[in-house]
Amino acid sequence: MSNFYELNLNELDKELSPLEKREWDNIYASYRSGTPLSGKVSGVDRRRIQDTPDESHDQLYFLVIVPYRVKIMIPEEETGFWDSREQAVRVMRGMFGTKIDFVITAIDRENSLCVASRKRAMEIQRRMFAQTNPQIGDRIETQILAAGSTSVIASAGGFDFHL
């Protein structure tokens, strides 16, 4: 990946359609200011990592989001599901079609690829939630992230919990 701030974005973006331009503008804004974006999980990708000292972790799993044409990948350790690697991968596979928030952390403009963090978006949500001063008995909007045969993982106010 090249340095984002060294790219000539006007040159790279001059032949984009209006939808592509809007997609990239949102990505640039998230990267520069750390503002969260939202998107639906379209799948889980597994990539082999070269030169890892621990061969049991020579593959990484990523949540994949494709808002329009750009592939946004969230590494397993940035999903927020890191009690155990097996649990993280199992939850990730159950998230197909789930809308999640994320913050762009790296951009590979030439390959239309970005890396993002759900954990950073959750930190922002937690700060915003704390400012609402929730009280016992208040109703709080909750989102179901994944459902398994014996449990459900939900998110509210930047916190994930198992039901």
Where are these regions (language model features)?
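Single-stranded RNA-binding regions, centering on S1/OB-family and related RNA-binding modules
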Residues: 1-163
